[in-house]
Amino acid sequence: QTCALPILSLSLGYQYIHEYKKLNFKQDRGVSFFGDFFSVEGNKSIDDLSRFILNENIFYLKSNLNNLGDVNLSFKLIKWKNTYQVQSDVDLINSLNPQQSKILINWKKKLSNFNFYFDFDTSLNNSYKSNKIGLGIEGNFLNNFKFNITGSKFERSPNFNFILFRSKYENYNWYNPNLKDEKISKVSLDISFKDYLNLSGEYNIIDNFTFFRESANPLLGEFDVLRKAIPNQSINEIKYYKIKLYSNIPIGKFSLINTAQYQKKDQAVETGELSAINVPEWITRNTVMYSSKLFNRSLDIQTGVTFNYFTKFWANYYNPLISEFVVQNYKEIGEFPRFDFFFNAKIQQTRVFIKVEHLNSSFSGYDYYSDPFTPYRDLSVRFGLVWNFFQ
């Protein structure tokens, strides 16, 4: 009589992660766009300095439990240090030094043509936490069809920029220790057929969504030339879903490659609030491509045209002082078509490419932006040569 071992493999390990970031916002002279600033002994320059340090110790156990599947256990000890060095008269703390401990469990099991998996991630301290629970199944059904279904729930504290920020600019100093944790529930589905077709979708419910917004509210007729950015949390839950379809249809030497995405957000906006998570309702990208082999199959070429389009929406813009994107409900961008031409060639170890971007810019109007304050580039031509000396 024989007895199969319940554990086929077992391994212990340790991992150490150290991360260091230094951010320095410098201006020879402060500008009015960010509002008034502190002038120390007549010094009107801006030199805001911040440092972020992460130290993470990870102890893990990986095991294969035979019929029960693969189980991985981890324990993390995390220390953060986020400090500011600024010339400011505001009486606020200059650093955050939190610590956190976490337990993680990952399980995966293969049964026939299906893979099942489960993730559990919990923080032992109540502040600066990040919790997750998720499960999913993926596999094949019928011939050449694949699917993936997942469900997950997240709870996480806002990042450090929302909690503490210091600057020589008077309007950009805050300490918000009582922000609520964000909570996200998500389900997703992905179905594909060979490399020809892929359909995916997801549905999210978000509570306490945390974002930067303009202090003025255009929905109430307010306007602020300084466009001051402040931390904010949504009062009501936000529901967001999207459906994406990708297809690659070969027709002889031609290929039709199409991507279309529909997305929608449902948010009850209270008086004084802004509409957050603003996205274009429709996004589409369509390519017609010709591929061929010439000169006794020694030369490969690809050439074609790509069309891009998205509907209007309130796009976020980048604020360099806080290094974050800011939500605005003042200016919409979008609804401009963009055509790109490309040509690629390869012979042995040499590749050549030419790309003409936004070739329709001169005759389709000039109302095109990549964000509310940054025009999208006009027609541009890029070309290059790649030569590999060794195969």
List each model region and its residues.
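Exposed, low-structure sequence patches enriched in small/polar residues
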Residues: Q1-G30, F38-Q391
